[in-house]
Amino acid sequence: MERTYQYAWIIPFLTLAVPILIGLGLLLVPPATKSIRRIWAFPSVLLLSIVMVFSTNLSIQQINGNSIYQYLWSWTINSDSSLEFGYLIDSLTSIMSILIATVGMMVLIYSDNYMSHDKGYLRFFAYMSFFNTSMLGLVISPNLIQIYIFWELVGMCSYLSIGFWFTRPSAANACQKAFVTNRVGDFGLLLGILGLYWIAGSFEFRDLFDIFNDSIDNIDNNVLNSSFAILCASLLFLGAVAKSAQFPLHVWLPDAMEGPTPISALIHAATMVAAGIFLVARLLPLLTVIPYIMNLISLIGVITVLLGATLALAQKDIKRSLAYSTMSQLGYIMLASGIGSYRAALFHSITHAYSKALLFLGSGSIIHSMEPILGYSPDKSQNMVFMGGLSKYVPITKATFLLGTLSLCGIPPLACFWSKDEILNNSWLYSPIFAIIASSTTGLTAFYMFRMYLLTFEGHLRVHFKGDTNSSLYSISIWGKEGPEVFSRNLILLSMNNNQNEKVSSFLNKNKIYQIDRDVIKMRSFSTHFVKKETFPYPHESDNTMLFPLLLLAILTLFVGSVGIRFGQGVTDFDVLSKWLIPSISMDLFHEYLNPSADWYEFAQNAIYSVSIAFFGILIANLLYGSVHSSFQNLDLINSFAKIYTKIRIFSDQALNVIYNWSYNRGYIDLYYATILTRGIRGLAESTHFFDQRIIDGVTNAVGITNFFVGEAIKYMAGGRISSYLFFSLSSLSIALILVYFYLYF
């Protein structure tokens, strides 16, 4: 066992070999490296699978041995302090390592086929492997300095991955937006780390936890500066807020969908957004002893839960809908951390990671099947209003996507049901208001997830549809409403152009079929070997190399929730997660959460309540988008109902219009940032530039010009005779003395 721990440092460096070898190959023998480019997927998957086996072995030893292992090397040593680096193996490290390795391996297998026609295939696998290296290095870090180094590497990888298709302007803008937004959080994290070092004199987690735990009474008695400690903890949390897309630094997450779909799956399941959650989990023993910080964490979490769910309601891009879903689910995890439910937070991190990876890879399979028909423009191939009726074309993708959807909705016995219900149960004990918001959001989650599922897989394929006002399909808008006569035309589907300055119009215009855009094909040709791809009249199922990861993730989504189920007294040995979490330096303050007496009656009551809310959301989604709506439409019941209750209909349309505009325009938060912050900063910069150029430089230039002209005037007065110089000097001195005399005596 000791030998296994001794070689644990190799975990992050195994996958580093792939980007190094690809880089050397492209530098030294580029033709040969490119000719065997598909072979590079094998070492990428192989090395990450070794990491997975190694992490699994560590986890088994953690569960059986309840041990923590830390090894440090001194980096710099002086009389006052020393800077060390090394690795820390505890339950949190092993959990995150397995999560990163399993999700990363599935994504790499999937990507081999998904990216096979892309010119950036080698660059893609280099980015992905380095992404995994950075995240694995982050989770084994034993101190804040090492965490910050790998934290920045994770941010760099996300920047490169989001802007993978950098020739596309939207992708270039998205990676810059993600980079700048995360700069805010990273700067806060750096200041927080330096502040903690100023207080405690150490970067090591163990030292920080011991110092702050021993100083609880001192903080209350103002022996330590509690205000400064609160400021430092808030700055640390700011880094997690930006990385995990929490309000108000969440704005980068939907734009990050400009990258390839496998990268989106990795970012949302196991790397980028998981980094912020990991940081909060690692620092939780420290954050709990600092006043008000836990309240701040839970408040930000519950705001993000609700905001992410509302912003997902009206999105038409399938990946952006999933992005806002990720934001909301991360809010649940942050809420659990803020209320001290460490176990529930990690449990939901595990279940959500596999469910969300399944959904993102499923969406990639859908996009992959739609691209030959619609072209390679994300505005079309990712747009749900062009989909529909895909069940018969992509049945395996449909089945796995439905499984992930049900899991995220919290339907038993799937994975997310167990973890989300534990968070809801604990939130009732902490704050009824937070619990009501979190419970209500489960209904919104079920609504927007089934809205996504129904728009994508149910109904008819809308890409080949010719607009006809007599057709029932013509009248279905993104909200499931009728368009032509009875219902408000303001809710008809938006045009495919994302430019919000353009007028709203129906995508099912009469006698019009959308064709593949030549400009779009030309744009994508920078990234692919083939300028044009063979077109198909209908979508087709993905290849086996893409379906295999979907099936494995579906199995994990079915059964991974069992690791955290509390079976009650007498069978607590089956509660694997609680036993797993015991050997953790982050668990010293949370033993009360590890071995509770599970009350199945109370659990069943809460579960029935939450599942009922979820089923209500599913029912509403079916009424608006499913076969129930079509049946009502064929029986003409909606029109007759609307004629009787016209005023109610008008009011409901107006209310839905407000909700739609709020959701589609991202809550106007991006607009606020663009108007207030961006323009304000630019205005301040222009004012500063004017002051510097006209005032500061003007005074300096004026002095120089004045000296120049004075010198020129004196030059013409000089004749080269010493007697003249003496005369002018004595005359000036006489005048000065006369003036002084009159000033003193008169």
Curated annotation (Swiss-Prot):
Keywords from the named record: Chloroplast, Membrane, NAD, NADP, Plastid, Plastoquinone, Quinone, Thylakoid, Translocase, Transmembrane, Transmembrane helix, Transport
GO biological process, one term: ATP synthesis coupled electron transport
Residue ranges of the TM segments: 9-29, 39-59, 89-109, 125-145, 147-167, 185-205, 222-242, 261-281, 283-303, 330-350, 357-377, 399-419, 428-448, 545-565, 608-628, 726-746
Paired cysteines (S-S): none
Reaction(s) this enzyme catalyzes, per UniProt: a plastoquinone + NADH + (n+1) H(+)(in) = a plastoquinol + NAD(+) + n H(+)(out); a plastoquinone + NADPH + (n+1) H(+)(in) = a plastoquinol + NADP(+) + n H(+)(out)
Membrane protein topology class: Multi-pass membrane protein
EC number: 7.1.1.-
Enzyme class: translocase
Subunit and partners: NDH is composed of at least 16 different subunits, 5 of which are encoded in the nucleus.
Role summary: NDH shuttles electrons from NAD(P)H:plastoquinone, via FMN and iron-sulfur (Fe-S) centers, to quinones in the photosynthetic chain and possibly in a chloroplast respiratory chain. The immediate electron acceptor for the enzyme in this species is believed to be plastoquinone. Couples the redox reaction to proton translocation, and thus conserves the redox energy in a proton gradient.
Record protein name field: NAD(P)H-quinone oxidoreductase subunit 5, chloroplastic
The species this protein was found in: Amborella trichopoda
